[in-house]
Amino acid sequence: MLDVNNFEYMKIGLASPDKIRSWSHGEVKKPETINYRTLKPERDGLFCERIFGPMKDWECSCGKYKRVRYKGVVCDRCGVEVTKSKVRRERMGHIELAAPVSHIWYFKGIPSRMGLVMDMSPRALEEIIYFASYVVTEPGDTPLEKKQLLSEREYRVYREKYGKGFSAGMGAEAIKKILADIDLEKETNDLKEELKSAQGQRRTRAIRRLEVMEAFRNSGNNPSWMVLDVLPVIPPEIRPMVQLEGGRFATSDLNDLYRRVINRNNRLKRLLDLGAPNIIVQNEKRMLQEAVDALIDNGRRGRPVTGPGNRPLKSLSHMLKGKQGRFRQNLLGKRVDYSGRSVIVVGPNLKMYQCGLPKEMALELFKPFVMKELVGRGLAHNIKSAKRKIERMAPEIWDVLEEVIREHPVLLNRAPTLHRLGIQAFEPTLVEGRAIRLHPLVCTAYNADFDGDQMAVHVPLSAEAQAEARILMLAAQNILNPKDGKPVVTPSQDMVLGNYYLTLERENAVGEGTIFKDINEAQLAYQNGYVHLHSRIAVFAGSIPNERFTDEQRNQLLITTVGKLIFNTILPKSFPYINEPTKFNLEIETPAKYFVDTTTDVRAHIAAQELIDPFKKKILGNIIAEVFKKFHITETSKMLDRMKDLGFKISTKAGMTVGIADILTLEEKHEILEKAHDTVEKITKSFRRGLITDDERYERVIGVWNAAKDEIQGKLILSLDRLNPIFMMQDSGARGNISNFTQLAGMRGLMADPSGRIVELPITSNFREGLTVLEYFISTHGARKGLTDTALKTADSGYLTRRLVDVAQDVIIREDDCGTDRGLTIKAIREGTEIIEPLEERLEGRYSRKTIRHPETKEVIARENDLITEAIATQIVDAGIEEVTIRSAFTCNTKHGVCKKCYGKNLATGTEVEVGEAVGIIAAQSIGEPGTQLTMRTFHTGGVAGDDITQGLPRIQEIFEARNPKGQAIITEVGGEVVSIEEGRDRQQEITIQGTDDRRSYNIPYTARLRVEEGTIVERGEALTEGSVDPKALIRVRDVLSVQEYLLAEVQKVYRMQGVEIGDKHVEVMVRQMLRKIRVMDTGDTNILPGTLMDIHTFTEANRDAILSGSQPATGRPVLLGITKASLETDSFLSAASFQETTRVLTDAAIKGKRDELLGLKENVILGKLVPAGTGIGRYRKLKSEVIKETAEVTDEITNI
């Protein structure tokens, strides 16, 4: 038996007529499908049972042989083989064409492959194939030339003149004859000769022809196979015909297209037998050609064939293309059994690793397991009765169900799955009702809320799948976000509010300055109303079970609040007692100033102290990160649950409400507005007198109103009571921000009009007072724009993620160390004077390339190939080192992936990355997922003649697609000193740069803003004006590494401006994929074709062989490809075809006879194999498990894994 999942590679090629006949099980001669009375397939028709196999299992057509025992018998009456009906999905038929027909893919694609092989223009080919002109196939000894086109009249004239002295023909037959006559060897050698002298257009054409010729030569395909003599007919189950109610039939469009081909073919055969006049035969041949074209690719040439209702029919090509095509609909995304979906509701009392599964749903999902267990326990005699029991919902099944789902994790997924945290595993618990219960802390990762979101459940079946779900995907394991290594499960909303309220301090609260002997006493006093949560009190420090206190501190009093005492009970004992929201307190110890001797006057001491800020959302996040660093997964997930419970409990007790009385308006608002109106009036006067331009007036007016709004906002914040519920909500980070409050109580400020331009009429009212009709109207613009932008952005961002995933899907950690001697020198990324990404953030979790020493003491901070931890990174920055050389994905030598050392730490686990980790896909998701948070619009930068700089999502697309940027900067091609900046004609400026050996001048347009002045020293490739550099121009004047660094910095700028943090390594992986190819300039003595795009590794290998054999190596220059182009240029044709331009990719691959080595993930998913990543990678698949010893029954909780 052939193991379908065990093969090395997949190859595609052209099929010869004999090959097509060998696939076939018989010829389809009639266009009939099924008999309308008996509903049985017609013999020799498109559904014929004799050709394709029986309709019913183990039963021939006439019913003579029934049952399995006749397996393999061919019925003597009807000729049908007795076998399974499933063969109707795999058996093919064929149609013997009465005249050869050209294959539209090879004739019509761009460039026309047929045209390149024959060296004819596509126009000429079309005339021949569709019977408009004759072509000379054999000139004989006449003055005609081979492949010369003749019109009908010319043909007749030459026939009379030369008689049988030459042969010419039309249609695909003539093409076939010419193709068959081509001598590939001779043509190839001629083209190689021509290349030596040819220039310009002729050279390009010669290279393209040579490429196709070499492809045919190397693949063993015969050019004449581009013309079909036999047409394969795909199996009937793949183009089914089904009966609808009311006796009508629905059928696949392919059947209609096949019927047209068969009808025309049969008519042509009859005409040829009758010896019909040539013109009629020619017309029929042309119609046959068009019918086959429509079958293969309808609509590629001329008007598409339409079905009822003027709808174009779906041809074979359309079955593969697009989102609904075979590749994306059925091969890359399949529907799976053992799954369900339902609405989600919050489950605040669940543990971190649990989810609530509705009983009915669980019963259906785990049905086979329950049935097996029922039979096993003797509650049912056989599977059938077990099934009946379940359908009747007998009471005894519930206990069995609980037993079955215990320790059997399920996967929960929420669409859209933007990153890997969109699918996580949970341990199910049964709940009443029909809604899935979700743990509140995982909502951030799923981006879920409970306003009607739905989620899907999947059951991992095999033991291996369950183990992977539990060990790798359990929600308690996914605490860190893969994009930046920060915790993704931070408390939100009510939980934040509760912990904020708990840790507030209040002056002169009830019982301030009371001294307690321990926590219990303090809590008792609080419950009886003697002290408040916010009262500052003293507690005997020795009673607090904290291992960080010194012996001296244990004998002192700790100044804290009741709330903070309660808050600290949720933290591990060896964690510092957190009394203030500072980094010092978090990472090192509780500051000494909070400890006082027992003799101190506590009340006076407290009265002299400032109030400490409560713990906001950010601090809670830092606490989680710190706990994770020190105690890892189990302890963190328990702590998170405690923090969640505490937050919910206290926010319930706090009873925060928002009433209209909480929104207090500002007394001085009227004065501020008056002042602003006066200033605007003055600006308008200056404009009327012609002192300033309209643009300047506009900018200044906007400035005035923004200043007014800011002033109101500032005074509002100062006038607010710290205990105002709205203020507490926004200050804690639970919900809303200060600008929401300003709009409620201050003024709404300026709005944007539909084009995104700011309207200079401000909205001076706030929501508390109410808006005037005009103000309301102005504000509708902005609201509408916000919503449309969001909708458009989501689609754009999703498509960006898809392209990123496609280009990086085969980047996997393949080995431990690639042994490279190159590295990337990094420093902090800056925009002007502002630091966008500091050096320590870029260093942490990377391997050093060289030994790093302290500049003064010369002591070693990190050795070569050491992992730089957070502590080492801080040391490096503190030592004043500004740039460090690290191992980077840019310089990694690993083929088809990167190595562990060049990648560094896995951000999602905080540990070293494992071999087999699919870092490409993680990188793509990390860049794509925050895409929805980026803005859409191009910002209008200040300044009168300011260019629009693209930012946000459009800028990210521009970078990754390597497009020419908007507002492009002019770069210098020489390094040296700027010697002069002069004003040329048309108010242009001319910059002259004196290099070491040459001098260049650049004309700068009048509107551009300069970045250099006379005397500036510039490097090659440096920008002379403000704006974005075109990376394709940069790669021409600088090396690859500078382009990579530039792209990395640009991507980071966009994301950091929007407050999104992404690890450098993700961008590095993507940029590495854009620069994988090299364009061959000079072929040397290798047999590479000039102008070919090839993988750098393949290129180096070809050159290595050339150098070793002592011949001249080829030279090439690196090429920067946009991600779409890079995806289509991948070595895997399956991956490229399933991405975009399916027909073009397949045409090309077929001619080249390409092999797909199945290295990426996508190709393997398409073929239904295990992906070569994670546990599916070769080195893990070969491991065999063995039992060392049986373990005792484990009763421990799942969290301890």
Curated annotation (Swiss-Prot):
InterPro entries named in the record: DNA-dir_RpoC_beta_prime, DNA-dir_RpoC_beta_prime_bact, RNA_pol_asu, RNA_pol_N, RNA_pol_Rpb1_1, RNA_pol_Rpb1_3, RNA_pol_Rpb1_3_sf, RNA_pol_Rpb1_4
Pfam name, any one: RNA_pol_Rpb1_3
Keywords: DNA-directed RNA polymerase, Magnesium, Metal-binding, Nucleotidyltransferase, Transcription, Transferase, Zinc
Residue positions binding Mg(2+): D449, D451, D453
Binding site for Zn(2+) 1: C60, C62, C75, C78
BP term (GO), one: DNA-templated transcription
CDD domains: RNAP_beta'_C, RNAP_beta'_N
Broad class of enzyme this protein falls into: transferase
Chemical reaction(s) catalysed: RNA(n) + a ribonucleoside 5'-triphosphate = RNA(n+1) + diphosphate
GO cellular component terms, A-Z: DNA-directed RNA polymerase complex
Binding site for Zn(2+) 2: C818, C892, C899, C902
Signal peptide: none
Family of this protein: Belongs to the RNA polymerase beta' chain family.
Assembly mode: The RNAP catalytic core consists of 2 alpha, 1 beta, 1 beta' and 1 omega subunit. When a sigma factor is associated with the core the holoenzyme is formed, which can initiate transcription.
Function text: DNA-dependent RNA polymerase catalyzes the transcription of DNA into RNA using the four ribonucleoside triphosphates as substrates.
Name of the protein in question: DNA-directed RNA polymerase subunit beta'
Species in which this protein is naturally found: Listeria monocytogenes serotype 4b (strain F2365)
